[in-house]
Amino acid sequence: MPCLFIFIALLLSSCIGTLKALDQTCGNKVVNTIVVDQAGSGEGQRVTTITYNGHAATDVSSTFTSYPSHIVVRNLSIMNTYNRLTSLTKANGMSWDIKPAVAISVYGDKSAFYNCDFLGLQDTVWDNLGRHHFKNCYIEGAIDFIFGSGQSVYEDCHINATAGALASKVSFGYITAQGRSSDSDPSGFVFLRGSVSGSTSVYLGRAYGPFSRVIFIQTDLSSVVHPEGWYSWHYGGYEMSFTYAEVECKGAGSDMSRRVPWIDKLHSFYTKQQFSISNFIDQDQWISNIPRF
C-alpha cells in the first residue's frame, strides 16, 4: 500500500467519517482508492476534511499531493487554510499578503476525484500533469484556483469564486490558469455542465502557457464572471494560439457581447464531440473501468 495512504489514514483517524485506502485491480492495473464513508446520512462532503496551512512556495504548500497514476478519491474535503481568515480586521492587523497556498496537487495520470471539496484562495487545485476526471466536486478560490498543465474534465462541478474575508484585497480573480505549451500538447481543462458562482468577480481564465486551452460546455455562469471573460496575462501576442471557448453556456455571466475579440467561436456539435469525456481523456476507457462500490 502506498505510504501516502498510510499517512492520510493516520491523519484522519480522529476525524468524523472513516477513511478507506484500497488497492483494487482493474485489468492488469492496480487502482489505488481512497474512500471516506460519511458518518450518518445527509451530512455532505465536508464531514471528513484534511487541512494544512502551507504557503512557503507553490510546490511545497499543498495539503494533499498525489504522485502515482491510477488514483481514485471519493467523498473527501481538502483545504489549505492559509488565506482563509475569519475577519478582514485580522488581515489588516497582520498586513496580510495573499500567497499561493495549494489544497491539492495532482501529478499522476488517470486520476479521478468524485464528490470531493477543494478549498483555498490562490492556487487551490494544481492540476499538474496527466489525465484527470473531477466529478460532482466543489472548488473554491479566487486567484488561479484551478491551474497547471493537466488534461482534465470537470464534470458537474460547482466553482465558487470567493476571497472570503480578504475580498477587499482581490479586485478580480481568475478561475483557471492553464499551461498548454504547444499545439501538439494534449492538455487542457474542460468544464462540462456544472456552475460558476460566488462573490468575487472573476475571469474564466488567464494564460499560463502560449497555447493555453480551457473550454466551458453547457455551464451555468453567474454574474460574477467578468464581461471580458479571458485574459492573456504574460502571453500577449499569443492570443490566436489560445483555445478559449464557451459552448451553450447559460446564466447572467454567459453574455458574450463584451468578451475579448480573440475568444474562439467553436462549432457546438463538433466541440462537444471533440472534448467529450470519452474522446478527450477516456479513449482507453480507464474511467469506464474504475471499480464502483
From Swiss-Prot:
Q: Which InterPro entries match?
A: Pectin_lyas_fold, Pectin_lyase_fold/virulence, Pectinesterase_Asp_AS, Pectinesterase_cat
Gene Ontology molecular functions: pectinesterase activity
GO cellular component term of the entry, any: extracellular region
Q: Which UniProt keywords apply?
A: Aspartyl esterase, Cell wall, Cell wall biogenesis/degradation, Glycoprotein, Hydrolase, Secreted, Signal
Tell me the active site. D123, D144
As its record notes, the protein acts as a catalyst of:
[(1->4)-alpha-D-galacturonosyl methyl ester](n) + n H2O = [(1->4)-alpha-D-galacturonosyl](n) + n methanol + n H(+)
Q: Which residues form the signal peptide?
A: 1-21
Single Gene Ontology BP annotation: pectin catabolic process
Entry function? Acts in the modification of cell walls via demethylesterification of cell wall pectin.
Q: What's the protein here called?
A: Putative pectinesterase 52
**Species, as recorded:** Arabidopsis thaliana
